Amino acid sequence: MSSAPRRPASGADSFRTPEPESLGPGTPGFPEQEEDELHRTLGVERFEEILQEAGSRGGEEPGRSYGEEDFEYHRQSSHHIHHPLSTHLPPDARRRKTPQGPGRKPRRRPGASPTGATPTIEEGEEDEEEANEAEGARAPTEPSPASTPSSVQFFLQEDEGAERKAERTSPSPPTLLPHQEAAPWATEGAQTGVPVEEVAVVASGTAGGDNGGASGRPLTKAQPGHRSYNLQERRRIGSMTGAEQALLPRVPTDESEAQTLATADLDLMKSHRFEDVPGVRRHLVRKNAKGSAQSSREGREPGPTPRSRPRAPHKPHEVFVELNELLLDKNQEPQWRETARWIKFEEDVEEETERWGKPHVASLSFRSLLELRRTLAHGAVLLDLDQQTLPGVAHQVVEQMVISDQIKAEDRANVLRALLLKHSHPSDEKDFSFPRNISAGSLGSLLGHHHGQGAESDPHVTEPLIGGIPETRLDVERERDVPPSAPPAGITRSKSKHELKLLEKIPENAEATVVLVGCVEFLSRPTMAFVRLREAVELDAVLEVPVPVRFLFLLLGPSSANMDYHEIGRSISTLMSDKQFHEAAYLADEREDLLTAINAFLDCSVVLPPSEVQGEELLRSVAHFQRQMLKKREEQGRLLPPGLGLEPKSAQDKALLQMVEAAGAAEDDPLRRTGRPFGGLIRDVRRRYPHYLSDFRDALDPQCVAAVIFIYFAALSPAITFGGLLGEKTQDLIGVSELIMSTALQGVIFCLLGAQPLLVIGFSGPLLVFEEAFFTFCSSNQLEYLVGRVWIGFWLVLLALLMVALEGSFLVRFVSRFTQEIFAFLISLIFIYETFYKLIKIFQEHPLHGCSVSNSSETDSSENATWAGAGSTLGPANRSSAGQAGQGRPRGQPNTALLSLVLMAGTFFIAFFLRKFKNSRFFPGRIRRVIGDFGVPIAILIMVLVDYSIEDTYTQKLSVPSGFSVTAPDKRGWVINPLGEKSPFPVWMMVASLLPAILVFILIFMETQITTLIISKKERMLQKGSGFHLDLLLIVAMGGICALFGLPWLAAATVRSVTHANALTVMSKAVAPGDKPKIQEVKEQRVTGLLVALLVGLSIVIGDLLRQIPLAVLFGIFLYMGVTSLNGIQFYERLHLLLMPPKHHPDVTYVKKVRTLRMHLFTALQLLCLALLWAVMSTAASLAFPFILILTVPLRMVVLTRIFTEREMKCLDANEAEPVFDEREGVDEYNEMPMPV
């Protein structure tokens, strides 16, 4: 039900009962006696007696004046909605429309008015279903009318086509329900005679229907006295300002006629047409839609009852914010122009170029935030507004502005026109399809042009929106007939490339916030409205992209106001892009919730003093201080109530949550010991093998094909490099052919049976160092190198079984960053040293001034003569065979040393700078990544072509046999006899091989388990799990068996494994500009590793091509691996700090939290351990360097903990490396791991 306070013409006298009109003889009305009793009962005297009796029982303080506190209580509670008189009567007194009974006379319809009576004009219609439900709920408590025929009860209601009637019922004292409160205007007019401004009132007709006849607080009596009416009392929440129940200010006539009449005449017309005097049969006037925005749905005007208006779900979503400013276009016509947007960070439109600038953190002025808070405190706030189109929202916003006294009634049309102006975006000029921005006026003309219909088929605005005509008729009802989601007929537009690209960056299920700010001169002061729609809807031609809109913010005002509208718009946009604030905006129930959220935002904001900043280094403290504020904000967020936050409050809930988290963590920890033999291995099998079939199904993705090509070259290049160097170290007993076959066979088996198929197994630098040391040991003791490797492989299998049975993989947790960095730094130094050692050796064999010196050779004199004669005319055929196995290497060749230096340096610099190019700013990202990922093969190919083009200079080539053959067929075969090839192998060495087996096992264990730890980090979001015990057993066992065939041992290659995982990682496309990419999923499958292993094995057939690779090129790759391995090693960075003054130290944790001398002491201890390892490597005991390396683990756990505090150790020895997926300059996979290549 809806009603409104009436303005009496003459104060309290207007409530006097007029003389009853005589009814015609044919009128089927009440008898005259009953009619007289009705008039006497409904007269003002009887009405005032009821109020006085109720007021005396209410205990209200006489002569009380109402102040701001009463208003605040009145507005913040549910009582601030004005109710008609009928809602203050007890439930049994408010009779609803009921079906005609046999003893009840039929009611009169408007068309059947008596002769001589003026017919009524329809006003509204009440909901039949709600009336029947309310009648059914009150039926048991209502006494029968027949039981008390002498008493009369009155009721008020509005029905379309029905008059207000009074029937005889049982007496009931008029009382208020406990949750109701007498509206101040209910008695003010009768008691004081003060005119009351006419307002639009929304009343709940079923507010107390569920309580039946419950007794409550009686009506209060208002003593005579004047009280000014406050317009603030007419405020209401947005859910009660919907189009179904919005009753707008009643205008007695059209505006053109009202301008010619005096105020007294208008008041008289209002009194005559709108007053509702009790006991008098009067006309009901239908509202005139002219000059106001009338909205209705099926003619109903139901009140906002809880049953008919359920609360909308307020689940927070991701947001997209767009700032539109009211500016003039090139034709000097006003329009809404997009000037900024927020996905996570702010992006501004550059005025000169009309293109988007770089994303940045929004910097706001403190004054604009205070102005925003002030406008929100006094402006219009509409929450849960039920509208589907922009015109519908605009009508409700404008009317709420009038109600809240922000704008004058005559400014309604101008504000409405401003809200419905055209929207333009920077991308509009780039689209060559159908224009996307269609205003309401142009849309009407467009539809009329396409369909050939008259004015009746035009849409909702019949007058131009941009103009000075004050009379605008808006028909929202016709607008509602068109589904909001259906596009206009004949208008279809495909999304442009710009829209598709922007939609990829916006999170899924995001909802938009539209901010409209501008300067208009027709307003005398600023006006503001904050709107939250009940459901997110797509508003046509408003946003740059089709995203449903949930929030709108409007701020209009004159230029004379001391207010920066642009900065306030940026402030509310930044607030809405803030996660905590927009969640609070979703959950807000009233204005105070928004103001509280602004205060919380201000509490965590940073204010910079107005001083000049000379350099960016001066702002470092700002970032640090902001991180502290954000940490404090997160801690406060954990203390939210259970209804709002996820943190349990009671001690029992916290203890239970901790137990559940601990149990889940223990269950997911693959290194947790079970206490049973092979318990970890069994858990690995049970965890990983159920996903075996999905490991092949998940490979059906185009990204896996690209990963196969990339990882193939990433695996082949080290195989060729290490194979060539290993052949140099072992005199071709193990070379390129053996390493390629070992990589292929072990790779296939591991990809089929392994627990973590993302691992790429291959040869590494530490194994190369051990192979060289063991070959030197066997050569010096006259032992067969390959036979000794067979017995080492036998002990390796036994050691692996023992370690897996005892679940010893957990020991990898004790290998801290202290040991890893020493290990990685040692291998990098060995790589760099070996490169220059080989280069110096080439210069010694081929000196620069050796042209006048007679050539010499390692072969006999005949071969010497051959090389001397061909030294200057070495053709391609001879050059390609110059490095064949079994042939001697010439000495003293001219230009060989210089060419080798050029090839080595060129390979290194090409590979190094292509790696840097990957994260540079040139070319699109996809092209850069392809070039950077294939940097090593590109460098090898370029330098091979350079060497091939220089035909008259000798260079040593890679020794690769033709076909499926070992590197040196004259020295060994494919099967190695464990008892000895040329002589019996000593028995004591069979047993003593246990010692070198332990050393090899240490190297394989460290590399494999640390690599698995890096791959299995939580940040990578792997779903199928890993298997430390199963992978270790497979790799070591395969290495032991391969030793029988003279193949090298392999381990999990750290860099190649991380590169493989990164290639199979799918990053989310919905990444806000300026934000870090997030992992969407990882293609955990076995097919890519399997195909890579097969392709590496098939590479043996390209022996002719591999034989064209000079060894100097491999030395360049060796140098490249040594230098790049130093990246990300904190030990290497702290060595630089030894030579820097403290003021130039970087802003990192181990610098800020640890004193400089203590930090240098830790670096010195690491340097001492590194020197000890290098000394061991330089002696005959080089075979034992893994044992010295493993001693650094107890050194760190026992000795360093006594020298440094726990806090210092956490800063100096913490593993802070995170997976790297974004394109930061100078950062890639090498920065993630302190492990050797």
Curated annotation (Swiss-Prot):
Region ranges (Membrane (anion exchange)): 704-1237
Compositional bias annotation for Low complexity: 137-151
Tissue-level expression: Expressed in the ileum (at protein level).
An annotated GO BP: osteoclast differentiation
Acidic residues: compositionally biased ranges: 122-133
Keyword annotations of the record: Anion exchange, Antiport, Cell membrane, Glycoprotein, Ion transport, Lipoprotein, Membrane, Methylation, Palmitate, Phosphoprotein, Transmembrane, Transmembrane helix, Transport
Bias (Basic and acidic residues) ranges: 37-49, 58-75
Residue numbers with lipid attached (S-palmitoyl cysteine): C1169
Modified residues (N6-methyllysine): K270
Primary localization class, coarse: membrane
Glycosylation sites per record: N855, N864, N878
PROSITE patterns with a match to the protein in the record: ANION_EXCHANGER_1, ANION_EXCHANGER_2
Region (Disordered): 1-237, 281-316, 445-464
Family: Belongs to the anion exchanger (TC 2.A.31) family.
Purpose: Sodium-independent anion exchanger which mediates the electroneutral exchange of chloride for bicarbonate ions across the cell membrane. Plays an important role in osteoclast differentiation and function. Regulates bone resorption and calpain-dependent actin cytoskeleton organization in osteoclasts via anion exchange-dependent control of pH. Essential for intracellular pH regulation in CD8(+) T-cells upon CD3 stimulation, modulating CD8(+) T-cell response.
Protein name per UniProt: Anion exchange protein 2
